[in-house]
Regions:
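Short, well-formed alpha-helical segments that are part of the catalytic scaffolds
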Residues: 13-28
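A conserved acidic beta->alpha catalytic loop
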Residues: 23, 39-48, 64
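Glycine-rich, basic loop-to-helix element that forms the pyrophosphate-binding segment
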Residues: 61-79, 100
Length: 341
């Protein structure tokens, strides 16, 4: 039996996959590790690259995109190890990442799952490294933007648990699917990833089932990985919002009572509509901001010059009629700005 089985699900991210496999190779030097790449019908030459550069990697090649959960399960069922690591292809491990995580899991038998500190490609901490359970309130606070406004609040910031230090090891509710080290015998007890979740939400569901079984989910910042985020998907797209919303509702229907699931769906709907409205207002404001400022500056310039001319050249107070300031100048400036933009 191996110490660790690493499972990477790939979908058209050849260059990121190459990066992560190099980092896995480096981090596995003194360990007994097997690595699986499950490909969801990529067309970018990913698997040819793996076979050429990483012959030690075990592969599963699907003829269609089976989704994140099912693809992971394919490899987990074939794995023979004490621990399983679900790892995104758009990540990079430190050389000590695997050794430190395995050591912690070995010393803490009550830990069912473990996640690490993640940073993005710019070195910024990713708040999804540690998350709370998406209760109706927590989901509403996140999707409405209240969590971003009050990140340190235990009430509003519960989704990403920002009141917990990013540098301290803590028990958390939810681990990120980008790096999720799991105890294999716990998976045998609670079941694998729920394949109802095609993408998004499966990590929340699995984390919740780990805690229901009496085990802990641990945020472990003693090692850091890079997660470039969303290379296989576009997080700002309408499709992402739709899929993420459906995943959250599916989680609620699965684990909450019918009444509570209904409240969850209501709060999510409300948050989505609120966020969409704010986004529309912001987009509209951002489009007219520069033309408006140009209009204002030019108009005030005309006004200042006219008043100066009246005072120091014409020596006649109110030489220009009020209509000049209220209608003529604004009209000319408006036409000029419109012509420019």
């Amino acid at each position: 039996m191996h110490q660790l089985s690493i499972v990477i699900v790939n979908y058209n991210v050849k260059h990121f996959l190459e990066q992560v496999l190099y980092s896995v190779e480096s981090a596995s030097q003194s360990l007994d590790v097997e690595t699986w790449v499950v490909d969801n019908n990529s067309v970018d030459g990913s698997m040819e690259m793996v076979e050429s550069k990483f012959p030690w990697v075990k592969t599963i090649i699907n003829k269609e995109n089976l989704g994140f959960s099912k693809a992971n399960n394919q490899a987990i069922l074939k794995s023979k190890s004490r621990y399983v690591l679900l790892l995104n292809p758009d990540t990079v491990l430190q050389e000590d990442t695997l050794a430190k995580c395995i050591d912690y899991m070995d010393k803490n038998s009550d830990v069912g799952g473990l996640g690490v500190r993640m940073i993005d490609g710019k070195g910024c901490f990713l708040p999804e490294s540690k998350r709370g359970l998406p209760t109706p309130k927590a989901a509403f606070y996140k999707m409405s933007g209240l969590a971003a406004l009050f990140p340190k609040s235990r009430e509003f910031g519960r989704y990403h648990m920002k009141y917990l230090s990013e540098w301290e090891t803590n028990e958390v509710d939810v681990l990120a699917g980008a790096f999720m080290m799991l105890r294999n015998d716990v998976l045998a007890e609670i079941g694998l990833l729920d394949e109802q979740f095609f993408m998004y939400g499966e990590d929340i569901d699995l984390s919740y089932r780990i805690t229901l079984a009496g085990y802990k989910n641990i945020y472990f910042p003693e090692t850091t990985i890079i997660h470039y985020k969303g290379e296989s998907t576009k997080k700002k797209s309408v499709n992402y919002v739709k899929v993420f919303y459906n995943a959250m509702v599916l989680f609620a229907q699965k684990h909450y009572s019918a009444q509570r699931a209904g409240r969850f769906a209501f709060w999510i709907h409300l948050a989505i509509y609120l966020r969409a409205a704010l986004a529309l207002v912001w987009r509209g404001a951002s489009k007219i901001w520069v033309p408006f400022m140009d209009f204002l500056i030019v108009y005030l310039g005309y006004f200042g010059i006219a008043r100066y001319w009246e005072a120091y050249h014409k020596f006649v107070p109110n030489f220009y009629p009020i209509d000049y300031y209220l209608f003529h100048v604004p009209a000319y400036v408006f036409i000029a700005v419109i012509a420019i933009f």
